A protein has these predicted regions:
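Metal-dependent nuclease catalytic regions and adjoining charged, substrate-binding loops involved
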Residues: 6, 114-119, 124-214
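Secondary-structure capping and boundary motifs in well-ordered enzyme cores
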Residues: 1-2, 20, 24-28, 68-72, ...
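Non-catalytic protein-protein interaction segments used by genome-maintenance enzymes to assemble
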Residues: 50-132
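Residue-level signal for beta-strand positions within conserved beta-sheet cores that form or flank
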Residues: 44-47, 85, 135-137
Length: 214
């Protein structure tokens, strides 16, 4: 994996691994052996069906009198097939766990800090799989530094509904309604561009230069 994705040289040997690369390799190996693999072995009602898989879906919406589409896509870290035929989309994270949210509305209407991009991302991936593969999908976040805790769960925890581990179809109607409304506003020429109120949110935003916060 290191040869293919980092060095881009399948003929490289261990002698070519130096400095920071060796450190990262050791950290990743420790996360896998100490967290991901033991967790998966203890929760084995699934089969891995895809790794680093490109997914995409053209989402239809209406802006004024125009019928438009927005293409959502990305690379899903891992896709599992669960025993009942549903899919699970897994996103690996290295930070502190953030699995709780106050319903899908909070992902669209909260402040920058309340808009949990990790949860929104996995729900978008679940939406893509639902529409392109015709089955339900369960979003999951693997926070690898915390997976050795006995109480760890990668399932999203919806505090508004009091539900943990809900699949996409539970949210589909409301999630897509909010997504369409957000896109319609973005494409409405009558709505002026507004910078995020919380400037701290912009520190790691890829678009901060465009909106003059860079």
């Amino acid at each position: 994996a290191i040869n293919e994705n980092y060095l881009q040289d399948e003929r490289a040997s261990a002698e070519d691994y130096t400095g920071n690369l060796l450190l990262v390799k050791d950290i990743v190996t420790r996360y896998l052996r100490g967290g991901v693999m033991p967790y998966d072995a203890a929760h084995d009602a699934f089969a891995v069906s895809g790794l680093e898989e490109r997914v995409a879906y053209s989402f239809p919406f209406r802006a004024g009198e125009r019928e438009l589409e927005m293409k959502f896509g990305g690379i899903a870290d891992r896709i599992d097939t669960l025993d009942d035929g549903a899919l699970r989309v897994v996103d690996y994270k290295t930070g502190a766990p953030h699995l709780e949210f106050d319903g899908v509305e909070s992902l669209f209407t909260g402040t920058g800090k309340q808009r949990l991009s990790n949860i929104l991302q996995t729900l978008l991936y679940s939406m893509i799989l639902h529409h392109t593969r015709g089955c339900d999908a369960e979003p999951a976040l693997y926070y690898v530094r915390s997976m050795n805790r006995p109480d760890y769960s990668p399932q999203l925890d919806d505090k508004q509904l009091g539900v943990r581990g809900a699949r996409y179809t539970l949210y589909r109607e409301r999630f897509e309604e909010l997504l369409r409304a957000q896109l319609a506003e973005m494409y409405d020429p009558a709505v002026p561009f507004r910078q995020c109120e919380d400037a701290d949110t912009c520190k790691f935003c890829d678009f901060r230069i465009i909106c003059k916060r860079g």
